[in-house]
């Protein structure tokens, strides 16, 4: 059969490392109400203030990790698309970005123009958050509604603890963990605590451990932090790691609001000062390497760890276009339920 398309969706990237392109990208990203969940006037004012200095700073960071072919995130996502085209036998495989190009709107219209009426929408985020999964689904809904598209959607569900995903992580990281190391840090992208509190009012996010260790499935389904801990523990068990060999942290904090803890920056300092000499870092919230992994951890994080007394920080690559990951993703997408 060739009448069921697969649409992979990742976050996105500036078109280039120019300050103008980075400013345009950041404006689209930060003005998303699922990213900065404040009333429009407040959000507009805040983003305008951020865009005074941030584009130049971010442009420098992007330039430090930019590849000859372009943005690492886009290049690696394209490579995954190519591998997935060999796995997904039901129809074409396309790639869209939530921010930047190719947009979800342009790719959906392209698929419909080709005669596709069944589409599996695959947000490439293992854990659920409004600022990742929900905004992708809502953008697809907007396009369908505004263009009156006659399509049937399935949506890939969060797969933070699915065996195929954990086994793909194991296969891609085992060569690194077979070498001597002192500690493994699983650094996930952070979120403001208020994002989680809106979905689970009254749910405690305090402490360094799993906030959902004793929570109901309903609470866990909306708790990004708890899902990150489930990913980490499932991976550690799969690898046979003892509790003291690994820990969880959250990176990429923006602004002054309280974000979920423990913070990666603080953890890097702690580990260096505790005598950890060789630190492995993996970033399981990202399926493709990007500025948050390559620059934030691979460059700035490495320097910070060394300044705290550590000797070597090894950044374990994301799943990227690993064949086992593509096989796992194919299986997960085949199980995607009808939605939209």
Curated annotation (Swiss-Prot):
Keywords: Cytoplasm, Heme biosynthesis, Iron, Lyase, Metal-binding, Porphyrin biosynthesis. GO terms for cellular component: cytoplasm. GO terms for biological process: heme biosynthetic process. GO terms for molecular function: ferrochelatase activity; metal ion binding. This is Ferrochelatase. Catalyzes the ferrous insertion into protoporphyrin IX. Belongs to the ferrochelatase family. Its EC number is 4.98.1.1. CDD domains: Ferrochelatase_C, Ferrochelatase_N. Pathway: Porphyrin-containing compound metabolism; protoheme biosynthesis; protoheme from protoporphyrin-IX: step 1/1. The lineage of its organism: Bacteria, Pseudomonadati, Pseudomonadota, Gammaproteobacteria, Pseudomonadales.
């Amino acid at each position: 059969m060739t009448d069921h398309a697969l649409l992979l969706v990742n976050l996105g990237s500036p078109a280039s490392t120019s300050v103008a392109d980075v400013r345009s990208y950041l404006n689209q990203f930060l003005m998303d109400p699922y990213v900065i969940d404040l009333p429009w006037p407040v959000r507009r004012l805040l983003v305008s203030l951020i865009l005074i200095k941030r584009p130049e700073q971010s442009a420098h960071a992007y330039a430090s990790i930019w590849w000859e072919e372009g943005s690492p995130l886009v290049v690696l996502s394209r490579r995954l698309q190519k591998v997935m085209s060999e796995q997904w036998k039901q129809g074409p495989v396309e790639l869209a970005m939530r921010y930047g190009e190719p947009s979800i709107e342009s790719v959906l219209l392209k698929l419909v123009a080709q005669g596709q009426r069944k589409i599996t929408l695959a947000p490439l985020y293992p854990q659920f958050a409004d600022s990742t999964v929900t905004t992708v689904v809502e953008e697809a809904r907007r396009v369908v509604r505004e263009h009156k598209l006659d399509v049937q959607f399935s949506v890939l569900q969060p797969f933070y603890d699915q065996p195929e995903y954990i086994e793909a992580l194991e296969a891609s990281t085992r060569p690194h963990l077979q070498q001597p190391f002192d500690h493994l840090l699983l650094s996930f992208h952070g979120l403001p605590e208020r994002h989680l509190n809106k979905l689970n009012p009254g749910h405690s996010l305090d402490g360094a451990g799993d906030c959902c260790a004793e929570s109901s499935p309903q609470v866990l389904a909306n708790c990004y932090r708890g899902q990150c801990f489930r990913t980490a523990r499932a991976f550690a068990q799969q690898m046979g790691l003892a509790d003291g060999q690994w820990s969880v942290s959250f990176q990429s904090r923006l602004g002054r609001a309280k974000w979920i803890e423990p913070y990666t920056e603080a953890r890097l300092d702690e580990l260096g000062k505790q005598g950890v000499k060789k630190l492995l870092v993996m970033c399981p919230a990202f399926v493709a390497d990007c500025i948050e992994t390559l620059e934030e951890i691979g460059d700035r994080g490495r320097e910070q760890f060394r300044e705290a007394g550590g000797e070597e920080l090894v950044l374990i690559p994301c799943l990227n276009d690993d064949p086992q990951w593509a096989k796992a993703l194919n299986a997960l997408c085949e199980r995607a339920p009808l939605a939209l």
